[in-house]
Amino acid sequence: IVLETNDKCIIQNIQHVELFEGNIYILDDKSRTLCVFNMNGTFLYRIGDIGNGKGEHIELSDFAIDRKDKKIYLWDEATDKANVFDIDTKDYIYSIKTEREGSRSYYILYHNNKLYTNHTLLNNDDETHLLREIDCETGKQIATYLNCEEYNKGWNFPLRMANSCFYSQNTTSPKYVDIFGDTILSILPDRLIPAYVVES
């Protein structure tokens, strides 16, 4: 598919792509914009704008789609906030502000009415988890998972990868693996379980 190019949709570096209801959603890492195209490659519209106002973002780093309720979550890594939009109307609905508390998140996953973010530390403290579960309405942290010593060779410092640590996002069991991890985990409705282990 050849994508249309104009002043509103210059794609320079693709960070994340999703297909939903006949449209292609592309997050461009350079312009920090989410562009939507149809399956012929025709540009349709953008979701979200750069700024400090309601529904605006500073550093858009990821997005996730709630396919049941037709919502899209745009993750702003600069503020640890998700702006939520209605996919059909493109209207801004609300924002979910999480509690940063010395950490930074770059990637999100929406799965089974739950929102997950990766978790890296801006300072040294006692928190060593790599993944957190966030309430989709309040932004409160519900649970944490995966000790960095066991699942990422002890590494838990801010480092934004070229691609998300979430894979197979639109399946019944999405996968998670961190940059130095040797275990690929399946995210189930009630727990995380190892799916594959790489021996090295």
Indicate residue ranges for each PLM-predicted region.
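Eukaryotic scaffold repeat domains enriched in small/polar residues
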Residues: 1-200
